[in-house]
């Protein structure tokens, strides 16, 4: 690292408080970021005749959907105080947890109070970290010749992620003020946001390490300790809120409520109105009037605030999607309706970012391979994996329908993302994602994909979201010579994160280039990017493109006893599990375990998907 940053690094270490400087209980997890998969020198280990009996770690089940009951004004018997050593058992770092909670003057009876205390510490430290990173970024921008392009990009990512984490923690702090009356949906959102903070921190650190930044060396220990503070808070808050739900019998409720204004439309009706009214350069300003004239419609429907069009005609509102996004209002609520962007058929060579303040945006195209958003940023060309995306979305409740997203960098450019998604309650319907390595970055929070096509090679569905894929086609492409394909690479770093990749009723097959040369490479269902990686395949067709062992290790035996990989009721020539890996973190799921990874139970999608009017099923296709 050059001398210009040494003083700022020293400032960073001074600026961060005692909570960051507690000695770590173990070094931060820093596995490499998506290297090309090279052939193994040893053949895969053959499993025994019976699959392992240890099931994957399951997300907690949700309580019955009963009306919330207010807490009693006074409990019949006063619960005994809860000492820190007991409360800290719910966290992955009990020693650090006890050190932090030693500042609490008296032991409360409810672990929620411990969680609330640590949340204050988290928010305080997150704000300080954001300031430190922003100051460093300003120094780098002022004197760019002293830093590499990769370092500049990685530091910029850290600044963006740090600001996001502050916003998430502020939201959580506000929600926790009424923790006793929280519904399951709000609990799920709170724990998802806290899990997202942990993911943001890890993404920052990974990016700095990949960029070989001296800043990473200097700030690595404080970053690691702050990540542990976040993990401690996540464990305490998750345990406390789930305990309160059971205690007060809270209902599922709704995380994103609806309203009766401005206009409610079925999704397919909305699409037809847009395409008919705006066909061949007609004045699309009539679209909003037509929607208003249709008014309330029976059956499923969505709320529409305003509709704008993107295209080459003079009657279109905007020539680019980026300009249309910029025109959307900021910080809108669900009851205000969607800001609908209709992008005509065409090739849009632009890099679109939907920021955290742009919420309730619905992007509608003319269909797969008709409305195409394309870019070619890649890791080899100096972009971080996080920022190589052609299309990035952070704003809550984003919906995309009938759009193709591409990254055309090619396999020789390594990591090159088509879509990066860290938007809570986001949905992609009838879309396609085309790339090679790292095509679809399901970064964080809760996501749903329905009837989509995903193409790629190495780790082409990766990240640390709670992402569900229903009725999708997943195609492995032909990589470079001596590389192996992995469909998924989930990145859970904390056992309390309610994240994972759930693939239900999908087809896993070969793209045309690989189908023409099937013996050119080996394809696997996934590999563990991080220690608590979690992925399941349920009631899906698995073709013979998948190797009989099914799964691939990341780095030797690392994480194979802490991951959660499972399969349930799949079919097809590649679904035979008799030769699957014999890792302790892999198993064949039973019905009850598989149900934990459905829309109803894994993401509580039934509390936020109905407002999109996109079809979904909450459980399994069949249970026989």
Curated annotation (Swiss-Prot):
GO biological process, one term: cell wall modification
EC number: 3.1.1.11
Catalytic activity: [(1->4)-alpha-D-galacturonosyl methyl ester](n) + n H2O = [(1->4)-alpha-D-galacturonosyl](n) + n methanol + n H(+)
Disulfide bridge positions per record: 452-472
Residues reported in the UniProt entry to bind substrate: 385, 415, 527, 529
Pfam annotation, one family: Pectinesterase
Region (Pectinesterase 47): 307-606
Domain of life: Eukaryota
GO cellular component term, pick one: extracellular region
Renumbered residue ranges of the record's region Disordered: 24-88
Region Pectinesterase inhibitor 47, residue ranges: 74-236
Residues linked to a glycan: 225, 330, 369, 376, 387, 505, 555, 596, 601
Site (Transition state stabilizer): 437
Protein name, entry field: Probable pectinesterase/pectinesterase inhibitor 47
Native source species: Arabidopsis thaliana (Mouse-ear cress)
Name of the encoding gene: PME47
């Amino acid at each position: 690292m050059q001398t210009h940053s040494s003083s700022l690094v020293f400032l960073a270490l001074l600026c961060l408080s005692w909570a960051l400087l507690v000695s770590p209980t173990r070094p931060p997890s820093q596995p490499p970021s998506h290297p090309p998969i090279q052939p193994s020198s040893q053949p895969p280990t053959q499993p025994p005749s019976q699959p392992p009996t240890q099931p994957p770690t399951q997300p907690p089940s949700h309580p019955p959907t009963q009306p919330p009951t207010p807490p009693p004004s006074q409990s019949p018997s006063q619960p005994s105080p809860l000492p820190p050593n007991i409360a800290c058992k719910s966290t992955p770092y009990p020693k650090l947890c006890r050190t932090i909670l030693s500042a609490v003057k008296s032991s409360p009876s409810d672990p929620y109070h411990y969680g609330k205390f640590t949340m204050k510490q988290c928010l305080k430290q997150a704000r300080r970290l954001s300031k430190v990173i922003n100051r460093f970024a300003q120094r780098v921008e002022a004197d760019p010749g002293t830093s590499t392009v990769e370092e500049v990009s990685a530091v910029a990512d850290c600044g963006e992620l740090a600001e996001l984490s502050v916003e998430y923690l502020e939201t959580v702090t506000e929600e926790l003020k009424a923790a006793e009356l929280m519904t399951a949906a709000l609990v799920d959102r709170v724990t998802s946001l806290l899990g997202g903070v942990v993911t943001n921190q890890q993404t920052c650190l990974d990016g700095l390490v990949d960029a070989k930044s001296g800043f990473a060396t200097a700030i690595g220990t404080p970053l690691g300790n702050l990540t542990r503070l976040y993990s401690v808070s996540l464990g305490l808050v998750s345990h406390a809120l789930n305990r309160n739900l059971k205690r007060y019998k809270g209902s599922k409720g709704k995380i994103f409520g609806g309203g009766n204004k401005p206009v409610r439309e079925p999704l397919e009706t909305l699409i037809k109105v847009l395409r008919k009214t705006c066909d061949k350069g007609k004045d699309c300003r009539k679209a909003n009037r037509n929607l208003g004239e249709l008014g309330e419609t029976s059956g499923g429907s969505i709320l529409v605030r305003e509709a704008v069009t993107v295209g080459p005609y003079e009657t279109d509102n905007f020539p680019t999607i980026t300009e249309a996004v910029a025109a959307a209002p900021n910080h809108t609520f669900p009851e205000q309706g969607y800001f609908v962007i209709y992008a005509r058929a065409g090739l849009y060579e632009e890099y679109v970012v939907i920021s955290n303040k742009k919420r309730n945006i619905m992007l509608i195209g003319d269909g797969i391979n008709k409305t195409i958003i394309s870019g070619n940023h890649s890791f080899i060309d100096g972009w971080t994996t996080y920022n190589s995306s052609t299309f990035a979305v952070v704003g809550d409740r984003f919906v995309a329908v009938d759009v193709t997203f591409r990254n055309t960098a090619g396999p020789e450019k390594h990591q090159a993302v088509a879509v990066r998604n860290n938007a809570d309650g986001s949905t992609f319907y009838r879309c396609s994602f085309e790339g090679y390595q790292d095509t679809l970055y399901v970064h964080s929070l809760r996501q749903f994909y329905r009837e989509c096509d995903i193409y790629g090679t190495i780790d082409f569905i990766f990240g640390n979201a709670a992402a569900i894929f229903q009725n999708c086609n997943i195609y492995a492409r032909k990589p470079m010579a001596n590389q192996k394909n992995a469909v998924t690479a989930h990145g859970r770093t904390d056992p309390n994160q309610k994240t994972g990749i759930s693939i239900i009723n999908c087809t896993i097959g070969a793209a045309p280039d690989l189908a023409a040369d099937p013996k050119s490479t080996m394809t696997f269902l996934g590999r563990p990017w991080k220690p608590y990686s979690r992925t399941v395949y349920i009631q899906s067709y698995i073709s013979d493109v998948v190797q009989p062992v099914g799964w691939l290790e990341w780095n030797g035996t690392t994480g194979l006893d802490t991951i959660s990989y499972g399969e349930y009721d799949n079919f097809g020539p590649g679904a035979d599990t008799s030769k699957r890996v014999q890792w302790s973190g892999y198993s064949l799921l039973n019905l009850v375990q598989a149900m934990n990874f459905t829309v109803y139970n894994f993401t509580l999608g039934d509390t936020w998907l109905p407002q999109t009017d996109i079809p979904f099923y909450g459980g399994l296709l069949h249970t026989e």
